[in-house]
């Protein structure tokens, strides 16, 4: 079983026995999610924004308009954290202290890169579209150059 390296920044400390670092578990969460939270900083100001995404192999594609301020900020930041959470259930107990949530989550650390090549852009858009709307890519007309 292939695993991601455990480092100080990704090591689960509380309830560590529930943590999984194998590719199947991590990719399973990423493949089931629809929206990610992307965290980065500009100067001394932290930001976190929701973005749709798609995974292909070891690459995460984030969707954003090239002219958007956010995309320019991400491209200028050498480090980001992409987080995805899946809520599996709410556990109701006889006390609020014993109530909880069952969830799975993944934090991915990396450096964003703009996709400039038109063919790679289309391939990335297909990956993102299939993440959010499986099978829809085959049902719609091709994108135009302007789009």
Regions found by a protein language model. Give the residues of each.
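Charged, gly/pro-rich active-site loop segments
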Residues: 1-17, 89-147
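Short, intrinsically disordered, mixed-charge
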Residues: 31-32, 75-80, 126-134
């Amino acid at each position: 079983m292939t695993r991601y390296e455990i480092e100080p920044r990704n090591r689960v400390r509380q309830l560590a026995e529930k943590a999984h670092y194998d590719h199947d578990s991590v990719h399973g969460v990423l493949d089931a999610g629809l929206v990610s939270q992307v965290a980065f900083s500009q100067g001394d100001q932290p930001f976190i924004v929701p973005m749709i995404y798609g995974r292909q192999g070891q690459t995460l594609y984030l969707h954003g308009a090239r002219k958007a301020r956010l995309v320019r900020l991400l491209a200028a930041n050498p480090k980001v954290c992409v987080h995805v959470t899946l809520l599996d259930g709410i556990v109701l107990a006889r006390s609020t202290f014993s109530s909880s949530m069952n969830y799975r989550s993944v934090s991915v650390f990396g450096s964003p890169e703009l996709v400039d090549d038109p063919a790679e852009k289309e391939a990335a858009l297909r990956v993102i579209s299939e993440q959010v709307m499986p099978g829809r890519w085959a049902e719609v007309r091709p994108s135009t150059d302007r789009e």
